[in-house]
């Protein structure tokens, strides 16, 4: 098959002479009327097989959804199951092309149509498509059957190779068809689908170039791969229409005509400059619809509508620009399953929006989907809510070779083709561990081939010394760079149950109490933990830890020197049915629980992250609640970006808080008195800039119910859901923060109770008896395929009961097909507004450059301590007399601060003296850290600074529970696993050093 490329550029609007035709493609919702059987039934591929006893389901639907959060990840059932569906095509589909698109199956699947095998798909992650045209029976019933095996140890049939990402740590095994399925009916001259898996086609590619943000202009490009499956030549014209979010057509332009031979595949292109554009941005999900159409003899024969957005990016100098404004990455490393109790990952599109927009509400700007490619539904959701994404392909905790590496490159290729029109994807990630330079170059070539104009950086975790990477960053440590940006990929692994406020509150869980052992999903054995505290925190200490850990990255933000941190993502947003170390059988590192009820750290991040780099909107939050016994005297913690915070109790000032880590204010020994606790923040001029309060609630009196649902209403398609929120309130309608009452629910009408989660037997999964925790809980309720009114009643001992009703609306399904496309009517959210045109940060520090250095030993390696490479170091020879190094500066300066990354940063405290010329400007022991130490020195005019070890450094790990899943290796510069890494003698070892002048004295 030949492949040609035709291109035509129009700088102005094209004037179309075409006549609109209705003879265009149809996209059908193919989720309805599926039948499910758990177990291998080989005869099920035959169309006449009797499936009348099989379970009726609406997709997306994992066969083991009931196990989500009831079982730990490694216990999720893996087996063989079959899905079948009976359907008929409309009469006008005859002589057309018919394709089926599965957004994903888990893990390996054989596909049959009317008894004929049409293909195999095995990676368990990506979408796959099949051409059903040769097998379709027009005017008759058709049967599609899918045999799926979700074995944890599934191996590729042709090679016997296991997929690296089929992993019991991070990739929750919700087996079957947990994603959407679509049916496409097109003309025989058509634009292909972006389904390289099996179909080997690339579809439509939309992108912008020459973006001028201030003048709102760009050149919009469209490219469509088209194929002619007629038995004669076709002369084709190509047209592009750009439609804004209000449905207004703002520009139409055309490409050249082309003659496409039978069986030929070509690519048509067109481009035009467009004015008055709205650029997609953080918290500004402005999307356009781009309609690309094919015309023959003045008749439209095919049209594809692509929903996309346009934005400008740049990566360099250790920083990231979005629409010409520097942005520091602040967000979450979320499990790609993004799962919920009782249903797993298979939720409606509006609920994906609810969850993902909650990140934006918390002022996150980035979600890093972990280890495998995210579901298309989540990708499109992030487009709508304005949340930047890092898109993985597939991996585990290490680089690999041979067929496993080929599996990774193939998945990256397919994922890029499928998702390259989604503006929220700004990063392509090639691995959850460093990959080789050769592998990085190979992945980069894939990006350059299939998405050369998308404005996306491609990189991998680590990549500290591989300049071909366009971004990188470690998992737990602080990295800085003056070349490609570095952001931390999974910081702060601590866990805390939402139920536990603090030591002083019911149920009086002591901070850190929990088992000192857990079942490792790596070894499948029970392992001892030296210290369980960080995995069983109360909410107050969990919040403080999150503040401390973010401060490490904020301190190195753009504007603080030449080498900066581009931020980081905290590991997981919502509690997850994956690898855990705490008491419960699921991970509780989220800033929300699994039902997306915020914990205190959610609001702490909302305070700290409200700005592109520097804080732009002062905020304040009091950690915890204000309902205690009269004898309680406790610290009160306030999170604020204000310069000073004052606390008031019932109008009386309790003074100003003690400030730590820039954002944390502590008020010690506050005696509880019922009433109103207020915190007021002041700016540097003493003017009030933010205020918040807590109010003591009365005794529990009543239950309150409310719904959270789609803006489209509740659809009776068997897949749509609503969130039922239940709260225990006092007589005045205030939530009771210590209520943990068991609520008994009754459901009447066409609905299925999927429930919520709470601490207790089986985590209360699917139970209609569900306790509130801290006065609140939520439950999922799924529609049936019958519409009607649903009434829910909630009762509890000693509380006034409540009831609430909701009516589901019918969804038309005819012969297994529906024109209702969930998510199509969901609008982009514009909550943060367009990208500001003001600078995102003030320059607070400038570096004084280093010209050269001499040392007591290893002079040839002194440059390693200022080479912008955190995998190199200078070290002396271990003798006291050689434990010094002198740096010559590019100019005489009054240095205010010395910033260093010292080898063994988490293990060692170095006793140092620092001299400006011969004058001592600092003496002391450096702190242990997760990266850099900052030493405020006496500012003395000099062009020469000496660092000298003044004694034996002190060893011992200060961060023993901050560890990865995979074991670190002994030769890493943190010395965490090095033999005698904490025994340093007279070693002086420097990874990077910087000398800074403070401009904000």
Predicted regions and their residues:
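Disordered, acidic Ser/Thr/Pro-rich linker "stalks" and the adjacent N-terminal cap
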Residues: 51-60, 113, 823-895, 901-907, ...
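Beta-strand-rich structural segments
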Residues: 222-226, 293, 636-639, 680, ...
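Active-site-adjacent substrate/metal-binding segments within catalytic domains
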Residues: 61-89, 93-102, 106-114, 119-122, ...
């Amino acid at each position: 098959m030949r492949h040609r490329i035709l291109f035509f550029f129009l700088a102005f609007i094209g004037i179309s002479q075409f006549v609109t035709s209705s003879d265009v493609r149809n996209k059908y919702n193919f989720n309805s009327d599926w039948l499910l059987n758990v177990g291998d039934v080989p005869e099920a591929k035959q169309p006449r097989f009797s499936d009348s006893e099989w379970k009726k389901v609406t997709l997306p639907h994992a066969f083991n959804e009931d196990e989500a959060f009831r079982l730990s990840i490694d216990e999720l059932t893996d087996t063989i199951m079959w899905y079948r569906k009976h359907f008929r095509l409309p009469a006008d589909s005859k002589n057309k092309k018919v394709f089926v698109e599965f957004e994903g199956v888990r893990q390996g699947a054989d596909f049959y149509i009317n008894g004929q095998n049409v293909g195999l798909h095995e990676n368990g992650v990506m979408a796959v498509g099949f051409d059903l045209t040769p097998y379709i029976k027009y005017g008759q019933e058709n049967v599609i059957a899918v045999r799926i095996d979700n074995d944890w140890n599934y191996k590729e049939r042709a090679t016997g190779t296991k997929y690296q990402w089929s992993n019991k740590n991070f990739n929750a095994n919700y087996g079957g068809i947990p994603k959407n399925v679509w049916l496409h009916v097109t003309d025989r001259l058509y634009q292909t689908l972006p389904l390289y898996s099996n179909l080997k086609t690339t579809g439509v590619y939309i992108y912008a170039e020459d973006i001028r943000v201030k003048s709102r202009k760009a050149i919009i490009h469209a490219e469509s791969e088209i194929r002619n499956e007629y038995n004669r030549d076709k002369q084709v014209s190509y047209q592009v229409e750009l439609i804004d979010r209000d449905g207004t057509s703002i520009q139409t332009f055309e490409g050249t005509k082309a003659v496409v031979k039978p069986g030929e595949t070509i690519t048509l292109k067109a481009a035009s400059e467009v004015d008055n554009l709205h650029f997609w941005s953080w918290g500004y999900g402005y999307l356009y619809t781009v309609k690309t159409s094919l015309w023959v003899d003045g008749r439209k024969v095919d049209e594809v509508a692509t929903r996309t957005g346009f934005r400008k990016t740049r990566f360099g100098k250790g920083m990231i620009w979005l629409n010409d404004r520097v942005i520091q990455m602040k967000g979450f490393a979320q499990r790609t399953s993004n799962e919920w109790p009782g249903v797993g990952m298979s939720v409606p599109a509006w609920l994906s929006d609810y969850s993902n927009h909650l990140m934006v509400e918390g002022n996150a700007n980035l979600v890093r989907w972990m280890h495998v490619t995210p579901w298309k539904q989540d990708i499109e959701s992030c487009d709508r809510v304005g949340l930047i994404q890092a898109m993985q392909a597939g991996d585990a905790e290490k680089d690999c070779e041979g067929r496993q590496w080929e599996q990774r490159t193939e998945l990256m290729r397919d994922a890029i083709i499928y998702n390259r029109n989604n503006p929220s994807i700004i990063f392509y990630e090639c691995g959850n561990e460093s990959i080789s330079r050769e592998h990085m170059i190979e992945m980069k070539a894939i990006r350059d081939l299939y998405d050369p104009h998308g404005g996306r950086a491609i990189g991998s975790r680590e990549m500290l010394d591989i300049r071909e990477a366009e971004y990188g960053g470690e998992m737990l440590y602080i990295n800085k760079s003056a070349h490609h940006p570095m952001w931390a990929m999974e910081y702060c692994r601590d866990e805390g149950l939402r139920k536990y406020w603090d030591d002083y509150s019911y149920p009086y869980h002591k901070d850190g109490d929990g088992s000192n052992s857990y079942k490792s999903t790596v070894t499948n054995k029970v392992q001892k933990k030296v210290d369980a505290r960080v995995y069983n925190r109360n909410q107050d200490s969990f919040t403080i830890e999150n503040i401390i850990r973010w401060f490490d990255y904020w301190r190195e933000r753009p504007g603080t020197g030449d080498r900066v941190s581009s931020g980081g993502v905290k590991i997981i947003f919502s509690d997850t049915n994956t690898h855990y170390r705490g008491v419960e059988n699921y991970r509780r590192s989220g800033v929300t629980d699994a039902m997306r009820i915020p914990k205190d750290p959610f609001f702490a991040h909302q305070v700290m992250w409200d700005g592109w780099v520097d804080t732009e909107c002062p905020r304040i939050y009091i950690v915890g609640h204000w309902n205690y016994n009269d004898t309680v005297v406790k610290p009160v913690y306030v999170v604020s970006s204000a310069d000073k915070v004052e606390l008031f109790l019932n109008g009386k000032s309790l003074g100003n808080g003690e400030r730590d880590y820039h954002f944390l204010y502590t008020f010690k020994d506050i005696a509880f008195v019922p009433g109103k606790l207020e915190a007021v923040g002041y700016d540097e001029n003493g003017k009030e800039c933010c205020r918040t309060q807590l109010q003591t609630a009365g005794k529990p009196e009543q239950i309150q119910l409310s719904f959270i649902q789609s803006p489209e209403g509740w659809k009776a398609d068997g897949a749509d859901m609503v969130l039922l929120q239940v709260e225990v309130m006092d007589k005045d309608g205030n939530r009771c923060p210590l209520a943990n009452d068991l609520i008994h629910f009754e459901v009447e009408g066409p609905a299925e109770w999927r429930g919520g989660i709470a601490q207790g037997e089986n985590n209360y999964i699917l139970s209609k008896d569900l306790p509130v925790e801290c006065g609140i809980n939520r439950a999922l309720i799924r529609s049936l395929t019958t519409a009607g009114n649903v009434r829910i009643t909630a009762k509890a001992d000693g509380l006034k009961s409540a009831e609430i009703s909701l009516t589901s609306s019918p969804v038309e399904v005819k012969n297994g097909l529906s024109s209702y496309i969930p998510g199509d009517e969901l609008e982009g959210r514009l909550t943060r507004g367009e990208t500001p045109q003001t600078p995102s940060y003030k320059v607070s520090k400038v570096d004084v450059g280093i010209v050269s250095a001499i040392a007591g030993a290893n002079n040839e390696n002194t440059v390693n301590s200022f080479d912008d490479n955190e995998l190199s170091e200078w070290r002396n020879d271990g003798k006291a007399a050689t434990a010094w190094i002198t740096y010559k500066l590019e100019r005489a300066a009054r240095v205010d601060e010395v910033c260093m990354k010292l080898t063994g940063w988490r293990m060692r405290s170095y006793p140092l003296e620092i001299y400006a010329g011969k004058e001592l400007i600092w003496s002391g022991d450096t702190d242990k850290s997760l990266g850099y130490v900052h030493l405020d020195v006496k500012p003395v005019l000099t062009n020469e600074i000496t660092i000298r070890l003044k004694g034996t450094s002190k060893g011992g790990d200060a961060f023993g529970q901050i560890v990865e899943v995979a074991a670190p290796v002994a030769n890493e510069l943190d010395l965490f696993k090095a033999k005698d890494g904490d025994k340093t003698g007279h070693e002086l070892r420097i990874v990077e050093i910087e000398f800074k002048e403070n401009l904000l004295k």
